[in-house]
Amino acid sequence: MISGSDLRKGTTFELDGQVYTVIDFLHVKPGKGAAFVRTKLRNVIMGGVTDRTFNPTDKLQEAIIERKEMQYLYSDGELYYFMDQETFEQIPLNHEKVEDAIKFLKENMNAVIKFYKGEAFSVEAPNFVELLITECEPSVKGNTATTAMKTAVVETGATVMVPMFVEEGNTIRIDTRTGEYMERV
């Protein structure tokens, strides 16, 4: 059992016969009254998003999730194909199931696919990836009081904020959990 105060991004649980994963959460402690947890939930099976508020004392049934590392093969425009590296079985997934991870996945990269009762419902990119910058704004020198950042587009099409010294053609390491630049490789 999970208590309402244990809800975090990525937590998966059963509620009212449905399975939900937490997309976003906020612990609220008002000046008057009891604390509560405001969440944005995605229905794992149907794909819909809903807002729900929980008390910290609410008890929720944890869903049993299988995690399997698979290789991203290619996209045909509508579906994204992943291969089990043990059985060589290929599974197609639609954009709703890969939406956050696909920004950082290149062909032949490994990713973790989450399954609930044999049904794939989510893709997680590796925590850190190294990608080539294909487009980058020119560096403009100026009187900046803080670290100056500029926009860069990496080979997967994702947009990342990078420091001024990074140029087109550089390879950078990105934290896929936050989408932030980590370092130049």
Swiss-Prot record:
Keywords: Cytoplasm, Elongation factor, Protein biosynthesis. It comes from Clostridium perfringens (strain 13 / Type A). Gene3D superfamilies: 2.30.30.30, Nucleic acid-binding proteins (2.40.50.140). NCBIfam families: efp (TIGR00038), PRK00529.1 (NF001810). The keyword Transport does not apply. It is found in: Cytoplasm. Pathway: Protein biosynthesis; polypeptide chain elongation. Involved in peptide bond synthesis. Stimulates efficient translation and peptide-bond synthesis on native or reconstituted 70S ribosomes in vitro. Probably functions indirectly by altering the affinity of the ribosome for aminoacyl-tRNA, thus increasing their reactivity as acceptors for peptidyl transferase. Pfam families: EFP, EFP_N, Elong-fact-P_C. One of its GO terms (biological process) is peptide biosynthetic process. Belongs to the elongation factor P family. This is Elongation factor P. GO terms for cellular component: cytoplasm. GO terms for molecular function: translation elongation factor activity.
